[in-house]
Amino acid sequence: MTHRWGMAVDLDRCTGCEACVTACRTENNIRIAGPEQSARGRAIAWIRVERYYEGDFPDVRVKFRPVMCQQCDAAPCEPVCPTYASHHTDEGLNAQVYNRCIGTRYCANACPYSVRFFNFGNPVWDRPLELPLNPDVSVREVGVVEKCTFCVQRINAGKEQAKAENRELKDGEIKPACVQSCPASALVFGDLNDPESEVSRLSRSSRGTKLLEDLGTLPKVTYLQRQF
C-alpha cells in the first residue's frame, strides 16, 4: 500500500514552548541567520509557532499554533516551478530538489502559508556549532529555496528498517523531529492511507480544520481546534 503522510496538531496541547522549532533546526541543518539578516526578513524556520491573544489585560489568553509546510495535495508552489525542483512525490510529499532549484522564488511567492525560504547566503557555522550537523541531510547553498520535508530522511530510514526486517511499518514508528521533541504530544504524524492510524482518526475529528482551507490547496496537516 502506498503511504500518504500527514500530520495532526492538537491546539489544546500546544504550550508554545518551541521545542519543535529547535529540534527541526538541529535535525535539518537549518542555518542561523543572525540579527542583521533576520531584521531583513531572511531568517529561516521550517516550523514556526504563531501566537494569538484573546481578551483585555489583565484577563488575556494566549493561543499557539505551530505552522509548517502543509504538504498540500493541490500545492500552488509546484506548478510555478520552471525546473520541477518543487514537485509531488508518490507518497504525497511536496519535495524540493535543491540541485534543480535556480532560485526564481516563484514557489515562495505562490505559497499562501509563508513556509518556503530562500537562501540569501551560504551557511556558516562558527565553531563548535558545525559539530552536530546531521549527515543525513544536505546543507543548502546560496540561491536555493528550502522548506519542511516532514523529515523525509527519517521516513526513508524507517521504511528501509521495516523492509530489512521483512515487516510492515507500524503506526507511530516514524516521527519527524518536531513530533519526537514535543513534550505535550501536540503533534501526531502518520499514514493517512491507513484508516486505523492515529493521524487518520484525528483528521476525521469534529474538531479538525485545515489552514486556509478555502483556498483549495488540500493541505495534509489537520489542526484540532481548542476546546478550553
Give the predicted meaning of each segment.
Residues 1-228:
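Non-ligating segments of multi-cofactor redox enzymes
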